[in-house]
Amino acid sequence: MSNPFLKQVFNKDKTFRPKRKFEPGTQRFELHKKAQASLNAGLDLRLAVQLPPGEDLNDWVTVHVVDFFNRVNLIYGTISDGCTEQSCPVMSGGPKYEYRWQDEHKFRKPTALSAPRYMDLLMDWIEAQINNEDLFPTNVGTPFPKNFLQAVRKILSRLFRVFVHVYIHHFDRIAQMGSEAHVNTCYKHFYYFVKEFGLIDTKELEPLKEMTARMCH
């Protein structure tokens, strides 16, 4: 039986933006393969996120940040036709949580935006971070900057907000496509990873606290 969610994922018109990949033959490509092999083997996600012996933490984090960016991008891309200026005039996670956009360019102060506008700015911003050689060096031997993990925390905290919005405001669409299991697995993978390395503040996780307690016990 075909899965409509997977059809949406692989429909080029629905793909939010091109996937960032690792160059074959590089250390990160090998790490990415190792991480994917663990997932495909059905390894407990708590174990799958742990740093493999002898590997560099920053490289391991880089591989996962890129992977999560690609996966969350696809998840949002599949429900984006139902996330409009009219349906989601404010980027939020239910009535208690509103997310305002701030950057170093146009929005220097936290600014209320519609969810689709926020998402567009967010994905552009993360893509720029990932492609910044000073922050995510691709050459072997080039050291990571001292603020690397601090920058990653900001990226992952903002990516988490996509999960919040999708789960709270668009879960009916996810259910309609029969893709709860896929999205839940992506979420659990993300959650176990950020918890393993302390990459998101507990208060940022609050909006999905009850769901997470049920899902990630």
From Swiss-Prot:
Give this protein's Gene Ontology molecular function annotations: metal ion binding
State if GTP-binding is listed as a keyword: no
List residues binding Zn(2+): C83, C88, H165, H170
Q: Which InterPro entries match?
A: MOB_kinase_act_fam, MOB_kinase_act_sf
Q: Tell me where on the tree of life, at the top rank, the source sits.
A: Eukaryota
Question: Is Coiled coil given among the entry's keywords?
Answer: no
Q: Which UniProt keywords apply?
A: Metal-binding, Zinc
Provide the family line.
Belongs to the MOB1/phocein family.
Summary of the function given for this chain in its UniProt record: May regulate the activity of kinases.
- What's the protein here called? MOB kinase activator 3A
What lineage does UniProt assign to this protein's organism? Eukaryota, Metazoa, Chordata, Craniata, Vertebrata
Report which gene this protein is encoded by: MOB3A
